[in-house]
Each structure stands twice: as structure tokens, then as C-alpha cells.
Amino acid sequence: MLSYEQLLRKPGAFKSITGISPDEFQALLAEVTPRYRAAEQKRLARQGRQRAPGGGLKSRHDLTERLLMTMVWLRLYLTCEAVGVLFGVDKSTVSRHTGPILRILCDLGVDTLGWPEEAQALVAATDPPSDSSGGAAPSEPNDGDPPSVIRPDGADLVAIIDATEQRIERSHDYATQKAAYSGKKKAHTRKTQLTVNEQGRIRDVSNSVPGSLHDISLLRQSGTLERLPPEITVMADSGYQGIQDDMPDRSVALPYRASRGHPLIPEQKLHNHDISSIRVVIENTIAALKHFRSLADVFRHAVERYDHVILAIVGIVNRRLDKRLARLAAA
């Protein structure tokens, strides 16, 4: 039977099974504990209880084991029955233990999002030239050079936007099937948009949408553009052609696209290469998220749980990057 003490003796296995190191687990437990206790107090104090607080069977799994159970589920994405076999409990117990923890991890993930208040001040030194009206000079889709300086202190100079898709089980309802079918992936998917800075730290996550929705349509309806600091450079792939029209006063860096009879010239190819060298950080961030099988395998659960799962893992990935950046800053 799997237990925290047993796994702790094998740090390599611990990280392989949970997706995080023992130190990361302890830091996460310290954040989960006060929120879990507050949620339990609220639950026990609710009106209409049929049993007095403290009554009923006592669980043999403390909060540490419940968090471990949840992390195993997120990392390996086993069925509740399989997780129950690992921990020696029934699948209903797994569901009952992991549900509240997942909601707390989701809330912790949300807490890591957002742009820092000082982002605009940090970007001010690299503002594009202003026009006579005092605003930033409007940019064409590809007329601006991508930022070439990536600051080691994690300053937000660039907002890199991309969407990730995950396969879901096909619905029995035809209308739902049609909405979820992604022509790009040739499968039924759920799509989520991510926005990261040049360090790969996730600053914004959209609500998930059916896979048939185009990336640029998701961007326009997500509210992401309204939440961006006003002077930050927006960077995306060629699928987002047209966003420069949505924000004419912003600096926008998009790659050139070749067309029939109009191949890219060397300068355009170099421009695209420069953008790709910066955009790779969002691909690495998405890969870090998909290290957890719950975001890589066919998602078996309801859409509401999908949003909880991705936000929970976003928080884990962001905290790991924050820790790495802090080490680099201290070196």
C-alpha cells in the first residue's frame, strides 16, 4: 500500500509518481493546510447537518495522504479505482478525498496568475517611439522587431499567447460533438489559451472552450487583451494574424506568412526565426503542464473539473519557475 513515508525514502520515485519533489510537496502542503482547515470548519458549521461535528467513521488518511493521493491522480491520471488500490481504499473514498483538495489547488493556481503591478514601469524604458498624439506608434503585423533582451529578473516585457488542446471523450449528443471537434487535431478536444511572459511564467489562463473555436476567436472573447499591461509587446504565432487590428496602439510581433508566388525573403525568415526563439518558452511551458498525464491523456471527466485541473497544475508549474528564478537571482 502506498504511503507518504514510504515514498519519502525514494525521492526519485516520489517525483516520478507525483510530478513534484518532496520539498515542493512540503511547500505545497503548507499552503493547502490553512485553506483546507477553513473549508472544513465551514463545512462542519453548515446548517441542516444530520450528524453532529465529530460523528461518523474516522478517516485513516490525514491531509498529507490526501494531498499525496491528489497529486498521484494529477500526475498519472489513473482511475479512482486504480488510485484506491494503491492507497488501500475504495474508489468512492478517493473521490471524496481528492475533490476538496483539487478545488484548493485550483484556488492556489489562480493566486499565481495576473500581471505584476510594476509591469508597466518595467516596460516603460523599452517603449516604442510615440507618435505626435502622444500614444505608441501603431505597428503593422510584422513591422516591429521582436524584443531581443530577456531580463534575468523576470520583468514582463512580452506577452506570448498560444492555445493548447486536449482530447476529450466524444459526447453522445451530436451538437456537442460538432462543437468539440477540432479540425486542427482531427479529434474532439477542449481548448485553453495561455499567456506567458518571456521567462515562461503563466500570467493568464482562459476558460476552456470547445475545440472547434478558432484561436483568435478565443483570444477576442477571453478578455486577455483587456487584462494586459498597456505597454507590453504582444507575441503570437501566425494563426493570430489580425490581432494587430484589435489593438492598433500596441506593439505586436507576428511571423510573416508565405503565400503562393510570394516566398519569404531572407529578412522575413530572420524575423520569423527571432520570434520563434522567444516563443519557444510557451511551448516549454505547455510541455511542463502536459508532464501531468491529467493534461496529456484523453480527459475522462466533466468540463468543470477540467478547468480545475489545469489551474491546479498551472499553480504548480508557476511556483516551480518562481523558485528557479529566485535561485538564479541569488546566484
What are these regions (language model features)?
Residues 62-77:
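Short, amphipathic alpha-helical "recognition" segments used to contact nucleic acids or chromatin
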Residues 1-61, 132, 325-329:
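Charged, often Cys/His-bearing segments associated with DNA-binding zinc-finger transcription factors
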Residues 50-65, 147-155:
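Glycine-rich, flexible loop segments associated with nucleotide phosphate handling
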Residues 82-106, 110-331:
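Short, well-ordered secondary-structure "scaffold" segments embedded in the functional core
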Residues 16, 57, 71, 207, ...:
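Conserved short-loop catalytic and cofactor-binding motifs
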Residues 30, 34-38, 75-79, 100-103, ...:
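Short helix-loop boundary/capping segments at the starts of domains
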